């Protein structure tokens, strides 16, 4: 998959002139120690060194493997304050607001007031990552990236992760990759009372492959571009399926019609986003369709058949 290639360093070409990730991580460590000394962030529990057995694959030159906690300056559960549909002005993001693909969904919100004890500490900041620690088996461990400018908070089934010195978009992509899912999440899921749970204290120990900072940004741009292309193709395929279904219905209607009525000759051009009138579908069924349009339909039909086989 795209994300798997991204975290293995196979999506973008490496530039030997880029500052190595090792230097970047050393600088982040020094900056965090300064922030701790200034009492701007809390001191974290020591993290274990990474053993050879834990390393999932060979990294490209200039990359480093680190624990997520090495690049965090905040790692905390959300509010347990009861939220409702009517009272309050601050939206509360909950586990259902993170989609299976890691996108954030801002519908079906509940609210709390500004006077609860968890605020302002638990206001979300743009760039915060939300980790789903309790949900169904398929959704537990999914992460969303908060990129709103408005005031939101989050519920206790989510964990807020605030990244420091690394592209939060890159980390978000990494945490939704197949690598992260199969090696860092699934082995530690616990099924309990009909729900899947992930120990929140484990998150900081998970492993993140870190490229040089410039390459992180290249990877994010490449993945976002490919995702947009994928979504556009998916929409075109759905439109083609809809057209094929309409065409098949007209073919069957034509084949089993008791009384055939002559139709004037027509030339049909293919437009994926249009709703095809019945008369045009019947004309297409009789073969009155431009050759290049027919070739396009045949090619798309073969692609659809290949995807569904």
Per-region residue spans from a language model:
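Non-catalytic DNA-recognition/assembly elements of restriction-modification systems
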Residues: 1, 10, 51-77, 213, ...
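Extended, domain-scale alpha-helical bundle/helix-rich regions
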Residues: 1-54, 263-265
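Short amphipathic alpha-helical coiled-coil/interface segments
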Residues: 21-32, 223-226, 244-252
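Sequence-specific dsDNA recognition surfaces
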Residues: 50-54, 69-82, 96-128, 298-302, ...
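Short, well-ordered beta-strand elements within core beta-sheets of diverse protein domains
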Residues: 56-59, 116, 159-163, 204-210
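Short, ligand-facing micro-motifs at secondary-structure edges
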Residues: 79, 99-110, 129-154, 169-173, ...
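A short glycine-rich beta-alpha junction/loop motif
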Residues: 151-158, 169, 190-213
């Amino acid at each position: 998959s795209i994300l798997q290639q991204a975290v293995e360093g196979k999506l973008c070409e490496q530039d030997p002139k880029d500052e190595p990730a090792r230097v970047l991580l050393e600088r982040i460590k020094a900056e965090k120690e300064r922030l701790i000394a200034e009492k701007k962030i809390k001191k974290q529990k020591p993290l274990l060194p990474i053993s050879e057995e834990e390393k999932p694959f060979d990294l490209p030159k200039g990359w480093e493997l680190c624990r997520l906690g090495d690049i965090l300056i905040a790692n905390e559960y959300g509010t347990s304050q009861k939220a409702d549909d009517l009272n309050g002005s601050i939206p509360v993001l909950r586990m259902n607001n993170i989609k299976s693909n890691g996108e954030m969904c801002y519908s079906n919100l509940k609210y709390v007031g500004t006077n609860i004890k968890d605020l302002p500490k638990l206001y979300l900041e743009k760039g915060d990552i939300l980790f789903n620690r309790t949900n169904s088996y398929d959704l537990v461990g999914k992460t969303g990236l908060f990129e709103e400018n408005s005031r939101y908070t989050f519920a206790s089934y989510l964990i807020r992760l605030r990244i420091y010195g690394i592209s939060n978009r890159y980390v978000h992509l990494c945490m939704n990759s197949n690598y992260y899912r199969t090696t860092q999440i699934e082995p530690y899921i616990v099924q309990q009372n009909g729900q899947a749970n992930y120990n929140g204290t484990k998150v900081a120990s998970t492993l993140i492959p870190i490229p040089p900072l410039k390459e992180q940004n290249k990877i994010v741009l490449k993945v976002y571009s490919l995702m947009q292309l994928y979504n556009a193709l998916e929409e075109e395929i759905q439109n083609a399926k809809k057209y094929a279904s309409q065409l098949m219905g007209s073919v069957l209607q034509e084949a089993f019609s008791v009384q055939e009525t002559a139709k004037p000759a027509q030339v049909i051009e293919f437009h994926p986003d249009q709703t095809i009138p019945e008369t045009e579908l019947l004309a297409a069924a009789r073969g009155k369709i431009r050759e290049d349009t027919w070739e396009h339909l045949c090619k798309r039909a073969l692609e659809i058949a290949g995807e569904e086989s």
